[in-house]
């Protein structure tokens, strides 16, 4: 992998999961530890990260900004266009699950005025949904490390009380072998459970996430009903069971 691509992958992981250790980065990127350390020195030199006491995290700007704000700024136009298209798959009167991802959070403005009920495991997502006047249930459970999301067995027990018509979620990436992947195990058990029990599943994924590899596999992409993206993937990249929806980005 070219050096600059690897550096960007490190920054992408830190945007989603921070702080993290160099060893975890090495595992997630399938790259030797000495190479990771060289990359971290380069990113530190560029003042893009802070590497201290074995932990790596994104360098903070002088203004106060949440990790969610950082992630929302990445591929913002693509995420907004994808969200608009995904919202059209939601039926009036349905119960919808939206995960804690920033891509899924772009759905919220598109849902205003719809007669739906939304479940979410994202604390910030729940607050934004309620502020938009949408009937919302915020699931309880253990707080995922380095995330404003809850997950775990207690969260799954709560989900079992609901009939979920549509699941809308995102992920760190899609591997070349067609697996939905993530560097953190935190929310995977909840996503896997809902994917098996929802009526319709919709994955929101911009083109920057194709061809990613990471430590944990969530599920085969072919288990998803719809992939909504800003670029048409090859059949090898996206063996989706039903349909790929490609949206133009203004």
Segments (PLM) and residue ranges:
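Conserved phosphate- and dinucleotide-binding cores of soluble alpha/beta proteins
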Residues: 2-5, 9-12, 19-23, 30-32, ...
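Internal active-site segments that recognize and position negatively charged phosphoryl groups
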Residues: 105
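Glycine- and other small-residue-rich loops at beta-strand/loop junctions that grip anionic moieties
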Residues: 75, 96, 118, 148, ...
């Amino acid at each position: 992998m070219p050096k600059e691509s690897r550096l960007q992958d490190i920054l992408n992981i830190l945007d989603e999961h921070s702080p993290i250790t160099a060893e975890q980065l090495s595992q997630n990127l399938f790259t030797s530890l000495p190479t990771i350390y060289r990359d971290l020195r380069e990113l530190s030199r560029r003042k893009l990260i802070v590497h201290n006491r074995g932990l790596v995290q994104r360098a903070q700007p002088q203004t106060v900004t949440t990790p969610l704000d950082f992630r929302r700024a990445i591929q913002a136009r693509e995420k907004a266009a994808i969200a608009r298209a995904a919202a059209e798959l939601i039926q009036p009167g349905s119960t919808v699950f939206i995960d804690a991802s920033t891509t899924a959070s772009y759905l919220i403005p598109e849902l205003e005025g719809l007669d739906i009920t939304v479940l979410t495991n994202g604390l910030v997502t729940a607050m934004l949904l309620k502020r938009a006047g949408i009937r919302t249930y915020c699931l309880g459970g253990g707080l995922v490390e380095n995330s404003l999301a809850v997950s775990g067995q207690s969260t799954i027990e709560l989900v079992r009380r609901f009939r979920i018509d549509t699941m809308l979620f995102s992920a760190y990436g899609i591997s070349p072998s067609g697996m939905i992947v993530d560097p953190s195990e935190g929310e995977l058990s909840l996503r896997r459970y809902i994917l098996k029990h929802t009526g319709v599943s919709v994955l929101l994924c911009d083109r920057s996430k194709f061809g990613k590899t990471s430590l944990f596999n969530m599920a085969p992409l072919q288990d998803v009903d719809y992939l909504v993206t800003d670029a048409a993937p090859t059949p090898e990249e996206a063996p989706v069971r039903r349909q790929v929806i490609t949206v133009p980005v203004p």
